[in-house]
Curated annotation (Swiss-Prot):
InterPro entries xref list: RsmH, SAM-dep_MeTrfase_MraW_recog, SAM-dependent_MTases_sf
Taxonomic lineage from the root: Bacteria, Pseudomonadati, Thermodesulfobacteriota, Desulfuromonadia, Geobacterales
Family: Belongs to the methyltransferase superfamily. RsmH family.
Disulfide bonds: none
Annotated catalysed reactions: cytidine(1402) in 16S rRNA + S-adenosyl-L-methionine = N(4)-methylcytidine(1402) in 16S rRNA + S-adenosyl-L-homocysteine + H(+)
Top-level taxon: Bacteria
GO cellular component terms given for this protein: cytoplasm
Designated name of the protein: Ribosomal RNA small subunit methyltransferase H
Protein task: Specifically methylates the N4 position of cytidine in position 1402 (C1402) of 16S rRNA.
Length: 313
């Protein structure tokens, strides 16, 4: 099994935006390899507390070892960050001074063939962040109708060939039985997309695999719920920082942040505010922060990363 290694994206930029301080309480909603978590703990020494969330038991076990030296300053929760509100209440934590969400699939999950996230190696078509619960990608591929499958691939993968891919998948499972492996699905996608339409730098199955992963793990729904929970729990002056990796995630982050920063929601035709809503956060990143060329050269995952941040008023 691959070692749970992970290069943290834009570590200096993230730390500057989160601005952890001694005595603060911070949430890392996507603990992963604990790279960002370790930096937060070091910056908030000697008594800052970190609550780390991950629904992947392998990630949680590896992270536990990597930050064990910080002792009782660490609380680990095996859960999706969308359940942050309930989990913090259980821990007796009322407010937090910051939260970080580093979205998407980790390099370890991609490199561990049996998890089924990668289209490069043959493996069971799984894609669950928590490999012990919920539907797999194979369940969706083999049970959904062509229309339902096309909708998922189109909406979550932004794939222009979604209808054709779904049609090929349904035809393949009808003729040859269930699609159970990653490369079986890759063959369907390659067959559906005309060779002339393949993009030079993107594998033809990239968007389909992204779409299924998002659907299997309810990534977009979890993101919105987690953002709301995090912002609601922030103390005045506390900060929320999010690293997204594709336009669907970034759109949700931008929308939620703007909603909390907007304040008044009255129609423009009204002469004065009657709703009474006040801005609850200040947006710290007018435009998303992007990785520099040097970082992208050493960590290609950073190429598509966008960082946005807010501060609670």
């Amino acid at each position: 099994m691959a070692e749970f290694g992970h290069l943290s994206v834009m570590p200096a930029e993230v730390l500057a935006l989160l601005s952890p301080r001694p005595g603060g309480v911070y949430v890392d909603g996507t603990l992963g390899g604990a790279g960002h978590a370790r930096m937060i703990l070091e910056a908030s020494s000697p008594d800052g507390v970190l609550v780390g969330f991950d629904r992947d038991p392998e990630a949680l076990a590896a992270a536990s070892k990597r930050i064990a030296s910080f002792g009782d300053r660490v609380r680990l929760v095996r859960s999706n960050f969308a359940a942050m509100d309930e989990s913090l209440a259980t821990l007796g934590i009322d407010t937090i001074d910051g939260f970080l969400l580093d979205l998407g699939v980790s390099s370890h999950q991609l490199d561990t063939a049996e998890r089924g996230f990668s289209f490069q190696v043959d493996a069971p078509l799984d894609m669950r962040m928590d490999p012990e619960t919920g539907e797999t990608a194979a369940d969706l591929v083999n049970e959904l109708s062509a229309d339902e499958l096309a909708r998922i691939i189109r909406e979550y993968g932004e794939e222009r060939w979604a209808k054709r891919i779904a049609s090929f998948v349904v035809k393949a499972r009808e003729q040859h039985g269930p699609i159970e492996s990653t490369l079986q699905l890759v063959d369907c996608v390659k067959g559906a997309i005309p060779r002339a339409a393949w993009e030079e730098r993107i594998h033809p199955a990239t968007r389909t695999f992204q779409a299924l992963r998002i659907a299997v793990n309810d990534e977009l729904g979890s993101l919105e719920r987690g953002l709301v929970a995090g912002i609601e729990r922030l103390a005045p002056g506390g900060r929320g920082v999010v690293i997204s990796f594709h336009s669907l995630e970034d759109r949700i982050v931008k929308t939620v942040f703007r909603r909390y920063a907007q304040g008044c929601t009255c129609p423009k035709m009204l002469p004065r505010c009657v709703c009474g809503n006040k801005p609850r956060v200040r947006i710290l990143t007018g435009k998303p922060v992007m990785a520099g060329g040097d970082e992208v050269a050493t960590n290609p995952r950073a190429r598509s990363a966008k960082v946005r941040a807010v501060e609670k008023l």
